[in-house]
């Protein structure tokens, strides 16, 4: 059988003149701005126009473009090779779909149709599910399929916050950086969300907590000083916390070394390479931090690629039901945005 694996990620501008249209695509997403289209369009234009100058400075730090597509291609190639090595009864081909920049679903679907798979497997590169990330990408894919009258067996791997190899991949990368550190604060930093999203039933924060708890318990380091915090807050709304910035300032001032783990990002991009590596390091230095280390995103870590491969290959063994994996509901029932409870 031929199987197409669709890897979803956010995307990023490939040159400075595309920063503003990238931002427009981000804010025009109804999962980000939940407004009627006639209001969402002008507001997205306004926000993207106002934020473009600051965002361009960020991408100038990265050489004028986001590295996320190249890094996702590396992940895609590694996963495709792993899948075809591990399961020689099927032929796998991986495709990349970015939500806010190229390659977009509307273009990639034609490549998928040319491959003519017996099954399409949707695999977000977001380990923890949120309606604003995985949910938005999955929804767009189904919309594009409907527009193109494309009907094929489709399975969805919605999330994998506690998958064993995913956890091991993080532990491996953390150990490399902390093995010689003393008197440090281990900070797990995830992208934040407005508090109202969580109150409406988005399982993201709960799933991030499950990831971190699993890692900390498996590391089993006596008296490990750790915390989970959230970064990248924008706008006037109240966001989930504590904020990574506040945690860095507080611990730098009391003489703690900082070890920072990007727990919800699996590839490097502006929010790791600029926000974590430059802006937050400057913040730590300014407040007296004597040493600041940043654990890398998982990238093509062997355990992480094995995690993705296991999810794709073993979903049948785990009795995939109603085209959604994981088969057992992981999230408590109050998280109504969890696709296992209420697929959108």
Language model segments and positions:
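Active-site-proximal alpha-helix that buttresses catalytic centers in soluble enzyme cores
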Residues: 1-344
């Amino acid at each position: 059988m031929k199987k197409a694996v669709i890897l979803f990620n956010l995307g990023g501008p490939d040159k400075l003149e595309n920063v503003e249209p990238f931002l427009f695509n981000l804010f025009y997403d109804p999962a980000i701005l939940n407004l009627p289209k006639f209001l969402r369009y002008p507001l997205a234009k306004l926000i993207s126009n106002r934020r473009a100058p600051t965002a361009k400075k960020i991408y100038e730090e990265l050489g004028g473009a986001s590295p996320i597509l190249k890094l996702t291609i590396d992940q895609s190639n590694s996963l495709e090779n792993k899948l075809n090595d591990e399961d020689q009864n099927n032929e796998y081909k991986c495709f990349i779909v970015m939500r806010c920049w190229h390659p977009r679903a509307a273009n990639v679907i034609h490549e998928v149709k040319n491959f003519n798979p017996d099954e399409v497997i949707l695999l977000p590169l977001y380990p923890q599910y949120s309606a604003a990330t995985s949910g938005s990408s999955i929804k767009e894919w189904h919309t594009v399929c409907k527009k193109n009258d494309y009907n094929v067996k489709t399975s969805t791997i919605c999330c994998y916050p506690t998958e064993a190899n995913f956890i091991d991949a993080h532990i491996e990368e953390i150990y490399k950086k902390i093995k010689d550190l003393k008197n440090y604060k281990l900070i797990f930093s995830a992208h934040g969300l407005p508090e109202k999203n969580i109150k409406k039933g988005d399982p993201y924060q709960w799933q991030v907590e499950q990831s971190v708890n699993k890692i900390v318990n498996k590391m089993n380091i006596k008296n490990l000083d750790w915390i989970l915090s959230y970064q990248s807050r924008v706008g006037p709304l109240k966001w989930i916390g504590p904020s990574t910035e506040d945690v860095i300032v507080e611990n730098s001032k009391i003489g703690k070394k900082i070890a920072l783990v990007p727990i919800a990002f699996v590839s490097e991009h502006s929010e790791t390479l600029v926000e974590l590596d430059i802006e937050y390091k400057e913040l730590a230095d300014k407040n007296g931090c004597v040493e600041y280390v940043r654990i890398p995103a998982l990238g093509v870590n062997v355990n992480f690629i094995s995690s993705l491969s296991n999810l794709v290959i073993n979903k049948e063994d785990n009795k995939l039901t109603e085209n959604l994996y994981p088969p057992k509901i992981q999230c408590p029932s109050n998280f109504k945005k969890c696709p296992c409870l209420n697929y959108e």
